Amino acid sequence: MKQYKILLIIADGLGDRPVSKLNGLTPLEAANKPAISDLLKNSMIGLMDPISPGVIPGSDTSHLSIFGLDPHVYYRGRGAFEALGAGATLKHGDVAFRGNFATVNNDLVVVDRRAGRKLEEGEELVKELNEKIKEINDVKIRFYKGTEHRVAVVLSGKGISDKVSDTDPHYEGLKVLESKPLEDSTEALRTAEIINILTRKVFDVLNSSEVNKRRIEQGEKPANIVLLRGAAHYIKLPSFSSYTKLKAAAVSATALIKGICRELGMNVVTPVGATGGIDTDYNAKAKAAIELLKENDFVFLHIKATDAASHDGLVEEKVKAIERIDKVIGTIVDNVGRDNLILMFTGDHATPVEVKEHSGDPVPILLYVPYPIINDNVRDFNEKEARKGSLRIRGLDVTNILLNYSNRAEKYGA
């Protein structure tokens, strides 16, 4: 029996709701999608709950689920994945945080949680922090530049805990929070104290940085604080190949996703021009996926632009991103050959563009196979048509479904 290559494409934050600017259509409905439409006659579509109905997924928990790992068992917090994706080498017991370069006033009140989002000087600021803040109370501190305004912070040493609260207030106009222990332990208390010392030291370094003085002179907001959240102890995950028997690779420019994929043992590629934002080079990502499909059984292609547009409330940009993803799908199918692969297209969660945040809505999902199946006979691929389809699954079902339709699944039982 022929075994097919597997291509999984995730448009981050794909799912949506009717949008007033689109006369009640969703962005997926409004988008022109000729390549996807061409696949429908040999496809099943439907809805996926990344975690379970009504649960609002993070991008971390949803991807774990989609890759076949129950987040209730394996999730330890986002910080470790962000750090791995940003290039950190972690060892058991390290505590990692995800963070934002942000702008605060002299009273540490947050003015901009993302310091304007685009931060070309991020590498310079990370280098300066690593040179000037190396250790606090015998605990080693390391900073790693992530995508755009994002940064990861890793603590290494004895007697530290991830059971501490965030310093990120999550809203502008609020003061940077004091980290507090989340359990009654010496380790949690010690770690919270270290984080609070770190917050003040980071502000002192960044507020006097020549980089930020230049930004102010150029009319830009200074990146003068790092807001921390998502503390996580590093605990190694099983490799993707160990439970799927697949040789796997991933294309992504987003630190979190790269971190998860690296931890799962996938070969992670970030092509030149891939940014993890709206301005990403879609063609470069398509070419990378095509090359990886030559040598791998499974290729995962992650595109962040849909989610970035949603969080910023950019309706037209989300529609354009979907249309560009459709071209990516067409390019890959034309080059690899529609008879040689199965293709799944979905989102890791819904981010309604008028809400600007993740929601617990189910996400539309499409599965194309190159051989005769009972297709769903739908006119389009969108949230409304998906309700007519045959698929009604959880994220945890995705990997098994892909193994089955690629003729790679093993029988369960005698």
Swiss-Prot record:
Gene that encodes it: apgM
| The protein's annotated pathway | Carbohydrate degradation; glycolysis; pyruvate from D-glyceraldehyde 3-phosphate: step 3/5
Keywords from UniProt, A to Z, are: Glycolysis, Isomerase
Source species: Saccharolobus islandicus (strain L.S.2.15 / Lassen #1) (Sulfolobus islandicus)
Task: Keyword check for Transport, yes or no.
Answer: no
Q: Does the keyword Isomerase apply?
A: yes
UniProt EC number:
5.4.2.12
Which GO MF terms are attached to this record?
Answer: metal ion binding; phosphoglycerate mutase activity
- Enzymatic class: isomerase
Q: Under which name does UniProt file this protein?
A: 2,3-bisphosphoglycerate-independent phosphoglycerate mutase
Identify its protein family: Belongs to the BPG-independent phosphoglycerate mutase family. A-PGAM subfamily.
Enumerate the PANTHER family for this protein: COFACTOR-INDEPENDENT PHOSPHOGLYCERATE MUTASE, METALLOENZYME DOMAIN-CONTAINING PROTEIN
GO BP annotations of the record are: glycolytic process
What this protein catalyses is: (2R)-2-phosphoglycerate = (2R)-3-phosphoglycerate
